[in-house]
Structures are given as C-alpha cells and as structure tokens.
C-alpha cells in the first residue's frame, strides 16, 4: 500500500462528514419513522413497538456478523473499511426513502408487511456502512489526542444534522399541529441524498494508516467464536457497552416521546424549532469544551461528573412540572451539556477498548469489537424505540384522535423526566464500577502497546 499523507484536518472533516452521512438517514428515521407510522399510516403504537423490537433485535444480531465479514476482508491497497462504505452507501439511501412512502391506503396487514420489509432491509444495508465507518477511526491514527479529536469531530457530524433537523422538521413536517404526509417523503429524500454525498467525501478524505492483517497461517480460518470469547474478557468494552446500553434506552425513550411532549403536553410542536436553534449554542460549547475537560479530568471521569449534574436537575423536574415550554427548553439545553460526554466521548472510549483488546490478545479485531459495541447500541435502540411506543399506549394515546386528553399529558411528563433520571443514573454507575480505563490507566495502556509494537519492529 502506498505511503499515505500524515493525519490532518482533512481526516477530521472527512470523519465528521461520515457521521453526518450516517445520521442523515439513521437519525432521521430514529426521530420520525415511528411518528410517521402512528400519525400518518395510523398504525397502533403497540404494533409499531413490536415491529421495531423484532427488527432491531435481528439487526443487533446482524452487526457482529457483518463485523466478522469486515475483519476477514483483506486490505488490497484500497483500505480495509473504505470499500464497504463506498459500495453500500447508495442502497442505504434508497431504502431510507422507501420507508417514508405513504401506504396508508393499503390494507392494515399490507401496511405492516411493507413497514417490516423496508425497515429490515434498510437496517442490513446501513449496518454494512456503519460497522466499517465506526472501525475506521481506529486505523486512522494511534495518537490518543488525535483519537479524542476524531471522537469530537464525529459527534459534530451528528450535532450538525440534529441541529438542522430539529429546526426544520417541526416547521416543514407539520401544519396546524398535524403531520403533512408528503413532506415526510420529501425530507427523507433530501436527507438520503445529502447522506450519500457526505459518505463519498469520507471515503476519499479519510486515510487508513494502521495496517494489521490477522496473524494466522494461510490455511487457518478466521475463528469468529474465539474472537467473541476474547471480547467477553475485555472489561473496557463490557463497561462501555453496558453503560451505553442503559443510557441509550433511557435517552432513546425520552427522545421518542419528545415530539409528543411538545405537541400534546405543551400544545405547540412548532416550538421545537426554538429548541433546535438553541441546540447550536449547547453543541458548540460541548464540542469546544469537552476536549479541555477530558484532557484535564479524563474521559471516564468527566462523563460521570457532568452526567450526575443533569440527573439531579431532572429529578427535581420530575416532582415540579413546568408549563412554560421556553423555560423547559433552556433547562433541557443546560442538562444536555451535562450528558454530552456520552455523545462526544463515547467513540474515544470504544477506541480505547480496541487498544485494550490488542493489549490482552495481541489482535485488534476492530470490526468485531466495534460491531460488538454497536450490537448493544442496536439492542438499546430496539428496546427504547419499542418502549417509547408502548409508553404512548400505556399513557392512553389515541391513534385516531387529533387532540389527546389531559390525563395522557400528565402521564407523559412523569414518564419523560423519570426515564431521563433512571437511564443516565444507571449509566453513570456502570461506567464507574465496570469500565477500568481512568486517565492514568489509559496512559499506561498506550505506553505498554507502544513498547510491544517497538519490540516487534526491532525483531
């Protein structure tokens, strides 16, 4: 493989665009697909919850399988991960659009079948993009500060998308507090095209620099089950997987209820656009400030300290409901700063877990380690997405009613704030007691790896 240029800002921007490209389809679907199913296709939220639980569970199982395929793919001069991103970006975009076709005139069973097919095929295509993209950062550099930068820049991609979609979505997708079916399809097409373009930039601007082919004999097969056994001993990976799982379940359920909170509790879904505009400020503060606080306190330490603050604030809100949506938006934004460490730094924790894997076994297995982590994220998304739909049904949401009753609104507030507290509190506790890589231990691990690599080179 020809010599590549040194790590630079071009790599960071390329990686940002990669996350933006992934978010353009995945996060748009995460935010609006369940809403589209219930408000446009008029599907019972219980059935939506079951559909998402089944398909996401399959998708979670699919992630390690794709990870194994990626790891078994040899670098033939074009990179180990880039070819996957290039090939599967287009079908991912197409399937995203098909998911928002208005089939409300279909028979109820046909609607369910269409939802199931488009949902699960999209997830397979997206997995073939997301696993290699997530693994890509671990082979772009082995410098700890550059990896932190990549994690920060990756979060910036998602932040850019969320900022735009949270502002534009409520203004474009709804009229008079009711959904406009054709606008969902239009916005999905816009997001899909932008996502495809961004991923093409990623495949050209990001360079793979750490080349570690599997150390096996020619006739030895890739032992998938041995790798799975190895990663179960990776305490760093287990810690970040469990912490993320719990946090995502809580936060995902909250996000799934967000539109209903503004639409049915505050009575104004369009005001979510104000939240989107203010999120630019919160995101910039988190993006700029996280680098310095993580360097000073350590990644694990900062995530725990700041998230605990947000948990306390939301615990107070649980007992003292707010009626002013603008006040809620401001308080929620401040709390976002507290939990932003989970978003901004989590991928740096995963990269550290890959190093921990190499330290323990001598093999990095980036694809499987990353996909194992993503397996738990997918399971969490499956649980949170389905549980959000179940929570709507339990709270008394009426799918055929344009305006919900007051009892539903009251239950919604308690559910929203309570899930936030429980989710992030448990995530912090798991990170504290299971994830072993403090600031000092991370430095020791990286030094040990450097010594081993130098010794191997000397031989």
Per-range role (PLM):
Residues 2-459:
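Membrane-embedded alpha-helical bundles of multi-pass transporters/translocases
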């Amino acid at each position: 493989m020809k010599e590549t240029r040194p790590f630079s800002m071009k790599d960071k921007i390329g990686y940002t665009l990669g996350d933006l490209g992934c978010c353009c389809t995945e996060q748009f679907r995460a935010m609006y697909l369940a809403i589209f199913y219930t408000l446009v296709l008029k599907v019972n939220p219980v059935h939506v919850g079951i559909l998402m639980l089944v398909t996401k569970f399959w998708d979670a199982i699919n992630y390690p399988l794709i990870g194994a395929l990626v790891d078994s793919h040899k670098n033939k001069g074009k990179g180990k991960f880039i070819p996957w991103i290039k090939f599967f970006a287009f079908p991912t975009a197409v399937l995203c659009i098909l998911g928002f076709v208005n089939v409300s005139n279909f028979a109820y069973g046909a609607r369910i079948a269409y939802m199931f097919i488009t949902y699960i095929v999209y997830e397979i295509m997206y997995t073939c993009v997301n696993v290699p993209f997530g693994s890509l950062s671990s082979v772009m550099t082995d410098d700890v500060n550059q990896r932190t930068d990549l994690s920060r820049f990756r979060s910036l991609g998602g932040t850019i998308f969320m900022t735009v979609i949270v502002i534009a979505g409520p203004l474009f997708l709804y009229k008079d507090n009711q959904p406009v079916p054709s606008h969902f399809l239009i916005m999905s097409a816009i997001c899909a095209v932008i996502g495809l373009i961004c991923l093409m930039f990623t495949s050209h601007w990001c360079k793979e620099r750490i080349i570690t082919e599997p150390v096996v004999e020619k006739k030895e097969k890739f032992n998938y089950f041995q790798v799975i056994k190895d990663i179960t001993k990776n305490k760093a990976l287990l810690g970040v997987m469990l912490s993320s799982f719990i946090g995502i379940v809580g936060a995902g359920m909250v996000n799934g209820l967000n539109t209903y909170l503004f639409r049915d509790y505050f009575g104004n879904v369009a005001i979510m656009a104000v939240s989107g505009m203010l999120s630019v400020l919160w995101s910039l503060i988190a993006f700029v400030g996280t680098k310095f606080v993580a360097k000073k306190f350590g990644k694990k330490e900062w995530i725990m300290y700041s998230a605990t603050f947000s948990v306390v604030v939301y615990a107070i809100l649980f007992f003292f409901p707010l009626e002013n949506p603008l006040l809620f938006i401001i308080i929620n934004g401040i709390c976002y700063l507290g939990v932003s460490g989970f978003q901004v730094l989590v991928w740096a924790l995963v990269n550290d877990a890959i190093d921990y894997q190499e330290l323990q076994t001598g093999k990095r297995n980036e694809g499987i380690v990353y996909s194992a982590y993503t397996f738990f994220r997918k399971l969490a998304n499956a649980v949170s997405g389905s549980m959000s739909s179940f929570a709507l049904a339990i709270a008394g949401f009426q799918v055929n009613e344009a305006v919900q009753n007051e009892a539903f609104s009251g239950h919604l507030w308690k559910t929203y704030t309570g899930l936030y507290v429980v989710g992030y509190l448990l995530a912090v506790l798991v990170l504290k007691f299971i994830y072993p890589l403090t600031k000092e231990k991370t430095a020791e691990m990286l030094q040990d790896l450097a010594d081993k690599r130098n010794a191997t080179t000397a031989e």
